[in-house]
Amino acid sequence: MVRPILHGTDGIRGKISASPKTDLEALEAIVHRREVNGRAFMVIGEAIGQILAEELDDHPKVVIGWDRRPGNAMLVSGLTDGLHSSSVRVIHAGIVATPGLHDAVLGTKSDAGLMVTASHNPHTDSGVKFFDAKGRKSMPSL
């Protein structure tokens, strides 16, 4: 049996959709229908926060950037809420190109960065890319 994959080669992406009522439904929307929503991003933010807290044994700092896609405000809000629930300090870089997030991670001395975008995908899609403390794209163990 093939296990569904949540994280692709360049982050998590999908069509922006409304948030379902439960965390499980939100994650199933990504895995089975490739739909992203604020609730799923809250769960993702919480998971990232827990991983960082375990690795760093402190209150990690994460910088979030995003592009102008409709629906990104909902996704950023979800990530922020999830990170805060794991005691992560969040800095919003605001609307920035993906290479700008690299600079924001380094400039703020953050432990990680999250870029909410879907790059070249249609404007109805969005997602999140992960950056490590050196501003490099990485593949967190989610």
Roles of regions detected by a PLM:
Residues 55-137:
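Ferredoxin-reductase
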Residues 140-142:
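Short, intrinsically disordered, charge-balanced linker/junction segments flanking boundaries
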